[in-house]
Amino acid sequence: MLFGGFFMSKAKEKKEVTTNQGKKHLFGSSEKSDFILNMSAESAQKLCGVYSIIAVLVLCVITIPYYFTQNIKYGMDESVNRTLYLNEKFIFFISAAVLAVGFVGFIIFLIANMKKQVELKDNKSLIVPLAVVLLSVISCLLSADIFTSFYGYLDRSEGMLTILGYWGLFAAGMTVTADDRRVKLSDFIVGIGAFEAIVGILQAIPATAKIVPNYFKEIFSGFSSGGMTYTKEYIATGFLCTPFALAAVLTVISAFALNGMLYDDKKARKIFYGISLALMTAADILACVIPAILGLGAVYVISLIIAAVKSGFAKDKKPFIACLVAFIVAGGIFAGLFASNEFRLMDEKIIFHDSFDRLSITGTGRGDDTEQWIYPYLWDDGMYTAEQNLIWGTGPDNWGTIFESGAIIDRSYNEYIDLLQSRGLIIFALTIVFLIMTIVKMCKLVAGFMKDKNSWTGCAVSAAVLCYLIQAFFNISSVTSSPYFWIAAGLVWSFTAVKSSAKKKS
């Protein structure tokens, strides 16, 4: 019997080995060494959360060399007698970083799907963003300049590759399904906002502006007998390239900071978020552009409305009072900067300085034949270009075709019109469908927050996305700002990423 039991156990082991033969595992590994197949749900949640943190840190750090190399010469373009500066090389690192973190984001999404952190069967509506990506490829291929539409043009760098990076960041955000991981990600995002705000404030103070690099320290003002003339203007940009990018980023992050300050249970986090919010409020005002004021105002007003309704459900008026105080403090900061002449709107000068001086891709401004406000003027140009390229657009970032249509600049400073003119009516319509689906999810998140069904992070990401969409009417997408929106949008979708699993557990 002893020997019989021994041979029977050996036969069983042999049978088990045989049944595992022929199975494919990730990276060609065996089942025991396949760390992804053996990963627990908690480990998968940690992987997704940690990667999203790494992604936002990379997006923050990668822009810094572009600033500190702006005056370092490395050669001469003799064909046009132009000095070459090292920052022209580093700007490509930013778009490359967006592509890289987006590509890895897709991989993280696939892993999350394997580990049931994202249930594709419960998210069939993902077919819409997939269609947007595939049709964007067609728009790129039909462009008059496929190379530019694929890689992007110079410092804009918003070609097809960057678009893929954006959607990869959306996918990465969608995988962060554990609420504690969302809170930790929020901590890093708010920290980045505070960092950019501090840099922006230092750029706007004459005494410190001398040592903090900035592309908007001097604004192009025209030509004279001696050549080009500039005026000193201390404008906040952070390390985000332009005041418009700073406005977009701080709009998104202010929503995280304000909601975390109002509703989180930890006192230390409340204090950190509150201080960060004050810094971001000041820096946003010092950006001196309409979308900064519009986005910031939307954050406070929407959060105040939510807090008022929440106080009725929870019978706790502390968040509403705290939000009202924050709103008053923000008004005080604005009044102080306005009284000291530090606040002024310089949208038109900034727009043309950015395109003419920083990017060298357009003329010096519009003619003197009109007194129309700059935004409707640019919107008219954008709509005309869209009408001439109605179905598939000009192709992503294809500035050449835009200029051929008579536009004075390659952007309309309205993200929706920019999308319509660059990628056409079909992709525009599908993107609107995607945004409507996202807004519906946001409404459900806020409704759930009112009834304590989900945490404040759902309210924060909803406010962040909505306020970004509001300021986008006066702004442009950018490799330094748009990634934060796409991560926030992914976080909105993360709350329904595992819908069926949640139902089974309940």
Question: What residue spans do the PLM features occupy?
Answer:
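Alpha-helical transmembrane segments of multi-pass inner-membrane proteins
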Residues: 10-18, 22-23, 28-29, 40-61, ...
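N-terminal hydrophobic segments of proteins, predominantly signal-anchor/transmembrane helices
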Residues: 54-75, 99-164
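Helix-to-loop transition at the C-terminal end of transmembrane segments
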Residues: 67-74, 145-147, 200-214, 338-349
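Juxtamembrane membrane-water interface segments that cap and precede transmembrane helices
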Residues: 73-88, 148, 223-239, 373, ...
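Alpha-helical transmembrane segments and their immediate interhelical/interface regions
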Residues: 74-95, 147-178, 293, 346-353
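Membrane-interface catalytic loops of GT-C/OST-like multi-pass glycosylation enzymes that act
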Residues: 150-155, 244, 288-295, 410-414, ...
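TM-adjacent membrane-interface loops and short helices in multi-pass inner/ER membrane proteins
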Residues: 208, 345-349, 353-409, 416, ...
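Membrane-interface capping segments at transmembrane-helix boundaries
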Residues: 497-505
